[in-house]
């Protein structure tokens, strides 16, 4: 088997291993590539994963989108809204193509994000009413849109309220392809739950871990722990990050840490830390998390990206 050399310019645009010169707005370019892929494969089963760069930094737009938001006085917010508009148009363009080819009744469409709005873009977007941002385990960092559409198969206009995770898309896609009995420890087929064929919740617990900081939640409660930072803003570089030690940041919490417990049903904005008043919940969730964490393989790649954040009045270290 012939192996190709590593990409010479990782931030360039490639088709397979060949660099492509792109002059147009990248969102539009990716959209047209996706439409072409659908047209080419319309007579056979296909899987299309379209991972748009927008609205990631750097914040950039073009006139056909920005003119829709001339009424916004803040430049960053105007550009960000324009980028979201380009994303919205992309989804519409792809859905329209599926409909025009008569594929919408046989195609599962999923729209999702990887994280919430980033705090470092200074007010261009908001996660309100949720707290936290990208890189955080607060709801503002991990609670994202998840939209599923499948004409004449999934119910329209329904809101599914049980906690799920994007890992579930793996088993869901496999089931949609005809292997409904397939499942893994981490991934659950969501189709029978969304169709209300199953009354239980897909998960008893959901877990997040990024270096030492972690979170675990059940249907009601959410527990988080962060290491208290032995650093200040003066230790941050020009990129807003801490310089990692040799070998990377530790994978375990420091001896000085904060514990946060929130009742997400009563307090989805995570404003009232109930850790001290509900020690039994803290203990239960801690035990569940530690059992899960002990089953994981040790990280192969050192953690080198880190910054500081103020959470519940304490400066903590985020690792991402």
Q: Predicted segments — roles?
A:
Residues 1-16, 56-62, 120-144, 221-247, ...:
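Core domains of carbohydrate- and sulfate-ester-processing enzymes
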Residues 1-45, 52-61, 81, 230, ...:
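Formylglycine-dependent
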Residues 4, 8-18, 92-100, 126-184, ...:
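Substrate-binding rim/cap in mid-to-C-terminal beta-strand-loop elements of soluble/periplasmic
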Residues 26-68, 95, 99-108, 139, ...:
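Active-site regions of oxyanion-processing enzymes, predominantly non-cytosolic
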Residues 28-32, 78, 85-89, 164-171, ...:
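A structural signal for well-ordered alpha-helical segments within the folded catalytic domains
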Residues 47-51, 108-112, 146-148, 165, ...:
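Structural recognition of the beta-strand scaffold that forms the well-ordered cores
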Residues 49-60, 111-117, 186, 209-211, ...:
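Short, solvent-exposed turn/loop segments enriched in Gly/Ser/Thr/Pro and often Arg
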Residues 138-142, 208-275:
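C-terminal, low-complexity/hydrophilic appendages and adjacent surface loops
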